[in-house]
Amino acid sequence: MLSTVTYAKKVKVEKEISDREYWTQMAYKIAAPVLSNMSKGELKKNMQVEISPTWDGRSKDVTYMECFGRLMSGIAPWLSLPDDDTEEGKMRRQLREWALKSYAHAVNPDSPDYLLWRNEGQPLVDAAYIASSFLRAKKQLWEPLDEVTKQRYIKEFQLLRRIDPPYTNWLLFSAMIESFLMEADAQYDLFRIHTAVRKAEEWYVGDGWYSDGETFAFDYYNSYVIQPMFVQVMQTVNDHKVILHDRSLEMQKKTEDLAKKRMQRFGMILERFISPEASFPVFGRSMTYRLGVFQPLSMLCWKDMLPKELPEGQVRNALTCVMKRLFAVDGNFNEKGFLQLGFAGHQTGLADWYSNNGSMYITSEVFLPLGLPASHSFWTAKPQDWTSKKAWSGHEFPKDHAIHY
């Protein structure tokens, strides 16, 4: 038998890493297989596509735009940070270089990785996430593209007007695309923006929640789409001082401010959903979107908009522990490093009829706080227990009350 001392010497002691190091390593792990392949025009060649057992029969080629668009929307803020010679900086620079080449392949009809822009309705969804990535990191991800590539994007975005979105969260996909066209100084359709804004306002049901269309559904689409995209659209329109029909800029600014306050309330609800054990409730459709659930909370962190009830160290600790718990489960990734269908691990039966493993990359939206530099207080603040952990440990924690705006 080995002595205790001898055995201890044989055990590899892993260096304890910071929360930020864990986040960046996980973001790189998710992004690298996608971008390293797509930068060479080899994503379609090498990505193992996995579709839901109840797939509706649409072209499986929608997978690649879902994968690329959702990934880039989540990591764009991180890639917008300036270069440095740290290990993180090297990863970030490599991903950005791959991403810029991938953006070009996505709209080049002669590339093997030209995405499915002109068939099916699904491209409206994931083009909106590509537009989101450009809005979130315009200087680093849009401006360096050559003029031919930029014009190709503008054309593809405009051609998506062929799709008549249903009166659900899909209206915001159209609005996101048109908002980016506004940002890019291209021809845009203000009616599509205004329609989405009007309907989002109508669909607010109270206490930080919007319905997804006329009827309320208890799911996480407030996280995946509605709240972040509504705020992004209003910010873009107001930044450009474009007046929507029958409104004033002052009215629109109030709409933006109100949407942000409601997102703060929703962020508080999401934080309270996190159990003492760092799990969160599994309900509603699209549960395979994993940590995309926390996009509003992550966006509040990135934009320095956390409400006073949520200290930065508390939110960072909560999100880190949830991330570690979920990704510690075997089966989240396949042998080539691509995400698989499932929530915690590989659970194909959870996938909805519209889901493929490209859809899973919306989990990247949790990484928005990486857009804050390592020196920011979000990353340096002392970790604190989150609300439910305080509550179930017998410690003081804030009371909770509904909002009425």
Residue ranges and their predicted role:
Residues D83-E87, W142, K241, S375-K382:
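Structured alpha-helical bundle/scaffold domains in large eukaryotic membrane-trafficking regulators
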